[in-house]
Amino acid sequence: MIINRRILKSFEEISHSLEESLREVAFDSQQQLIQDVREENEELSRLQDQLQLIRSIVEKICISIKTDNIDSYCSVPFDLLYNICKDIADPSSFEDGDLQYLVSQAIFEYIILLCYYSVTNECVQGLPAVYEAEQYYKTVSDSILKSFLYCLQNSVSTIRLLSQTVLKDVNKKKLSHQKWSLKALSVDLLEKIRPRINKFMVIRNFRFVGLPKKPIEIASLVSDIPRGIVHERLDMVTQSSKYYTIKLGQLITEFDQQPEENGMFTEVHLPNYERRLKSLQDFFGLAMSDSNLLDVIRCSAKFHKDHPLRRFTKPSILTRYWPSILLCLLYGPSSVMSLWNSRYFIQDFIKTNVVDFAKGLILNWLWAPLKQVWSTVKHDEGSAISVTSQETLNSDMDSLTRMIVSFVVDNSDSTSNSPIDPILLSTKVEHGDLTEFMEIYETQLHHPIKNIATGGLVRSLLIQLQKTKVDGSMALNGIDKMLKSQQLVFGVVALSPALVILYSSIVALKRFVKLGNVWSNEKRYREQISISLNNVERVLNYSKQGADADEEHLNQGLLVIEVSNLYKLGSFLIPRSRKKEWFRDVEELVDTNLDSGAHINVVNRIYHVYGRFLIH
């Protein structure tokens, strides 16, 4: 909780101030203290024991505050505090600077701070629920259907309260030996609810202009009754939220207000005793002259036990959902039997649409593409896409080489007097150099008919046909290589849908484990943080506009509530490594030592430092 850090600091200040005061008194008048201790050994021993009890309680609370749990709250044993305070005289009854004065005042300071800890935690934890209830009732009041549903949901509790009221009246009449009857009870009950009915009818009459028709008026009356009930509850919740927010702001402002430096305080005094006690007395409406610390402890214990803010929250889950639960109880058994009779159909449906889908997704869309990609990466020729065989191309090329070499050797006498080297000629043909063959072919074309008749030109044409076949095979081989180079891309494309589905499932599972919802609450958290930051900035902008005391206390209370929401919601979104920075910066928003301009700068710092975690 945002206030707890400041309370922890106050505990440390009290302990440090007590130690310094005791050390200074012991140093200044050691001999006199020894004599006083001998004379009042029993009283000092009792005070020391009570101080140790108080400090043990304080240590437990400090340990609870220092934990990482934001909503941690350590219950305060008010009965023990009451007994301790009852046995201790007021510090003003001792001499100023006396050892008993220092110890008793330290005990009182601790007790006051423990009461403040309990009250502020109740308010800071309870007021957000009250404001949430206010928003809930506003939403319900805007709809006739929701208003009817609200009245239906609360009908059971209304009947129960009515029965308790009637029973209480009957018992009262029995105790007073008065006669009673159903008619008399009905009259008494009508007299009790008559003011509410009159108020509702007066407000309702302002809505009509002219004289509506009778059916319309009756229908309007039926629809206005539920909405009137909701509006009455809304007004009560709104007034209560404003009242307790003002009280909280006043308590925080007065409790943390620095004392005036008028030269009346000495170093042995523990600070803020009377002022802090008065702030708690004002919170509970106690007169300072007629009340003391015992009354504050009693009121704090009652405030913690009764939880007055919980009376203004929205209806409980059982109240809101008992109609649905009743329908489930009425129609649930038959629905369960119907499901049981259809269990085989449901089983087949799940197997076909869930199990087979998951199995096919893993095997066909994840495992098979992964194998294909792996085979492509390690150059597995057996799994490659093939348009033509490499062995076929090699055999065709070898055949063409032999045909050309044989043809050139057979016709070399007629074209050249130099001997032909078959090995050199084979090398030239393999590299695409067909000069010798083309020269013979050109010579044969000079006498085509003669060469056709002798068969030489026919042989040349067949070689040309073989060359065309080899060229086509080489083109297909190039296409085959291009397809092989794209095979990895095809595999990744085939794998991508399954990877997207798998990644989404893992992210949903992670969010379910972390945030408790398959569909992440991050969007809702970011929206609430944006609203809180906006409200914080508005409160800070209007805090110094010459408002009255109640308005200033209301702004202070709203600021604490909104900052508390920021403190809590931001912990869900801020990375663990930066949570300490986040807590430090948010706590500066309620630091009373900073003015409104410095607070605005803190808001701007939050925007540009943590904006990528909270807003975007």
Swiss-Prot record:
Keywords annotated in UniProt: Membrane, Mitochondrion, Phosphoprotein, Transmembrane, Transmembrane helix
GO biological process: aerobic respiration; mRNA metabolic process
Keyword Phosphoprotein listed: yes
Transmembrane regions listed in the UniProt entry: 321-341, 488-508
Lipid bilayer topology: Multi-pass membrane protein
Subcellular location: Mitochondrion membrane
Residue numbers carrying Phosphoserine: S29
Superkingdom of origin organism: Eukaryota
Predominant cellular place of this UniProt entry's protein: mitochondrion
Presence of the UniProt keyword Mitochondrion in the record: yes
Pfam families in the cross-refs: NCA2 (PF08637)
Annotated Gene Ontology cellular component terms: mitochondrial outer membrane; mitochondrion
Record's miscellaneous remark: Present with 2940 molecules/cell in log phase SD medium.
Record function comment: Involved in the mitochondrial expression of subunits 6 and 8 of the F0-F1 ATP synthase.
Entry's family note: Belongs to the NCA2 family.
Name the UniProt record assigns to this protein: Nuclear control of ATPase protein 2
Name of the coding gene: NCA2
